[in-house]
């Protein structure tokens, strides 16, 4: 037979503990084309003067995997995309106005500008609460020079973020400039106009970190805890934001990169039958306006993070473990009976008898199973 004992509040204890795990991503994960998955959701077509049709297809974001994404064992690491604020100089300088419904209009020389604006709006809506709000670093700054017009978004996957990123553990290495395109930039070049859109660079790297975030706690009502990302060599230089619970990094492209650097190479263009057209202009605004989302992301992924086996991004995640401990206390002489058939003889008399020091014989038993029941005596758990 079972013996029941009612539990009191003193027998139940709830605890919360944190488990931290070190995460790091290597350069070749983000730079390799086989580890970046593109889902083509945008396509456009136009006729040139000769009536030939050319089109550009592109994704809105790219997902980076830890190995070839076609393998079943591959894991999603993060999403990478680009967005631009709707009232920024990048947009207003190339927009031809709006239609009667308020939709932004752009000339054919630009590509996917509405999609780039929509990405920024979506991120602002989810992290700041409204798509009219603009990201700024330091967080909440109202100074124009701290506003983020052109943003590179890194959306880390929940598999690695878990319940959030631990403050002051985030660090990322990035190259501020692409390979040189002109002899004026690099005297080693034999000719001007070398293509550098998708050519890696090996110098000029910086470490972007959230050092100091623990002493300056910022919070968004919609995005959770926020940290300011700075240059590790000059912590007064703000480069972006990190939303710890969301696992989203927002980088100010105009500060992490040289926006005036000349870009040379080929990008997709509307009405071009070869799907490419040469470009040789500044990174901002020319390249980010003229290139598709895939071309912009391909440039950053293939040239700005390196291509080796070294770590380019690392952080510690935080897993919250909620535990409820139920103490089943058995005091002296409690539960001294067993339903095991060997506990009694054929006549029903208890055979498990032990004589104590006073010569008093008492029965004894060993607890083998403990059941946890609710108020209706329904079994909930067994130990």
Predicted features, each with a name:
Residues 1-383:
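Long, position-biased, composition-driven segments near the start of the mature protein
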């Amino acid at each position: 037979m079972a013996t029941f004992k009612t539990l009191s509040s003193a027998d139940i204890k709830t605890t919360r503990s944190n488990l931290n795990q070190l995460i790091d991503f290597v350069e070749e994960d983000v730079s390799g084309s086989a580890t970046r998955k593109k889902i083509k959701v945008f396509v456009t077509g136009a006729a040139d003067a000769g009536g030939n049709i050319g089109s550009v297809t592109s994704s809105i974001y790219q997902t980076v995997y830890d190995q070839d994404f076609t393998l079943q064992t591959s894991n999603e690491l993060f999403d990478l995309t680009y967005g631009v604020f709707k009232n920024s100089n990048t947009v207003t300088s190339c927009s031809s106005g709006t239609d009667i419904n308020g939709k932004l209009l752009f000339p054919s020389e630009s590509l996917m500008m509405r999609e780039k604006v929509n990405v920024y709006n979506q991120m602002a809506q989810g992290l700041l609460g409204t798509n009219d709000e603009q990201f700024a670093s330091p967080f909440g700054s109202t100074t124009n020079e701290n506003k983020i017009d052109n943003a590179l978004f890194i959306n880390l996957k929940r598999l690695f973020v878990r319940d959030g990123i631990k403050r002051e553990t985030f660090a990322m290495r990035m190259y501020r400039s692409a390979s040189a395109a002109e002899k004026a930039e690099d005297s080693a070049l034999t000719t001007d106009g070398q293509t550098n859109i998708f050519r890696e660079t090996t110098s000029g790297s910086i470490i972007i970190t959230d050092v100091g975030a623990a002493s300056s706690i910022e919070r968004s009502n919609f995005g959770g805890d926020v940290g300011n990302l700075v240059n590790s060599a000059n912590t007064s230089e703000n480069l972006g934001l990190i939303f710890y619970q969301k696992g989203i990094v927002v980088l100010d492209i105009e500060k992490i990169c040289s926006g005036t650097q000349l870009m040379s190479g080929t990008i997709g263009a509307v009405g071009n039958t070869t799907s490419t057209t040469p470009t040789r202009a500044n990174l901002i605004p020319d390249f980010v306006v003229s290139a598709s989302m895939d071309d912009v992301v391909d440039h950053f992924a293939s040239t700005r993070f390196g291509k080796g086996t070294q770590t380019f991004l690392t952080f510690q995640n935080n897993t919250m473990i909620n535990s409820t401990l139920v103490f089943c206390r058995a005091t002296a002489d409690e539960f001294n009976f067993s339903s095991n058939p060997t506990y009694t003889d054929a006549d029903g008399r208890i055979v498990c008898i032990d004589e104590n020091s006073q010569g008093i014989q008492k029965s004894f038993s060993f607890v083998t199973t403990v059941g946890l029941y609710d108020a209706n005596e329904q079994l909930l758990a067994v130990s």
